[in-house]
Amino acid sequence: MRAFLTFTLFWIWTSSAFAQVFLNVQDFGGFPNDGASDDAALQSAFEEAAKQNAQGVFLPAGRWQFEKPIYVPRGLTLKGTYTRPHIAERADLEGAGTTIECYVGRAADIDKEPWKYESCVTLLGSATLDGVNLVYPEQADVWNPVPYSWTVFCNNDYDENHQVREISRCAVVNTTLVNSYAGIFMRWSANDHFISGVNMSVFKKGMVLDGITSLGVIQNVNIHNQYSWPFYGIKASDHAKAELLAKQNLENMTGIEFHRADWGWLNQVFIIYANKGFVFEKSMTAADSSQWEFGTRALPSFDISNSGCDLCNVAVEANFVNTGVGVNFSNSNLLGRVILGDSCYGSLRFTNAFFSFGVTGADVEKDQFTVGKHATLQIVNSEVLNFPEGISKEAPWRGKVFNVRGVLQLSNTVFAVPDTGRYDARTFEHLIVQGSGLATVQNVIFRGPEFRFSTKEKGRVRASMIGHREISEEMPYNPPR
């Protein structure tokens, strides 16, 4: 009995506390599901919340229509009903939970100075977006998407002398982006950004980070077109439509781009059907494109764990990476090519990773791993599977598993090529080292063909403790059916 009373009193207290710290937009004239603009009501609620030092503004369940950009003020939260991200079922889009309908940012050029365009939601200093769906009602044709600006935008506030007046430190949690053209952009959002529990379906780009510094966290993020299916009336049984949408994403969509960044952590991030999954580049800002301000600190450096890219054309592309810390992947599944460009002077390290390759017939001439002349690729305690299912036996694969012009360090790893009928046996090689490249291969087991490699120019290979096990009916790679 005492335990029951304690629980009851706690529930009453927390409910009362919530009512005090969050102002309800309905008390300011906002009404869901009526087809009318709720911009003025939300603005009034934010102004009053700031006066009362409240925690933020609460949007109850329903469809809320915003025809102007939403600016969440410094230190406040725009809160909906959801306590976790979800697949946006039709009932959710019809008002079972909090759904924000976005009408701003149409026909924006997100690849050139994207910060000049209005976003659906802009988070100011230490502001949070929590527990909502975001949907574009006018993005009606899934096969011909219209460009829109970023759905969620985080940016520092500057004065007239371009000095930082307010650091963003934005947070997006428990939120679903249903049919965004471009998802979340963090530009000069400084320390401590926090993205957690976000599902998104995007047509062009999922997330971009540019000009951030230490200690940002991104976790539990899924980028998958299935979150748009209910909006467009696509069912799981509609295999033809699902495959067509996946093909469209494979041609056009990028998962996450990392530009100027000092340090950050990613955990449990999943990307599927992307042309490019994880991309590492220099800053998008022209004044900072030389990366001179903080030297190599201006280039991306991240620790990425328990994450993956499934059925992507390019799983990882690194053209600029921090030459000190670099980028570290651990416990990752990466189904797609890995490219380290010639402009990459840093290193990518993979520990306990699984790699696979081959999505479309367009890959027949492409290499699974490319290491540019200044780059370093390290793979430890991993498995490399070469099983290009999308490549026919009539047009076999003619690329290399590793094409190295920089440095490759490969150890304690298994190579598997289970279907030798899908590559050209006359040209197949696990490794080619060119230019002044160097590859060390140690404690590696090859399943399928024995270790094949070649060198050109000044390329060198150092191999030791190499094992081989054939693949046959008696020793299959996959269990028998």
Give the ranges of each region predicted by the language model:
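Extracellular beta-strand-rich solenoid/capping regions of secreted or surface-exposed proteins
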Residues: 43-51, 64-79, 84-131, 135-168, ...
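N-terminal signal peptide c-region/cleavage motif recognized by signal peptidases
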Residues: 14-15
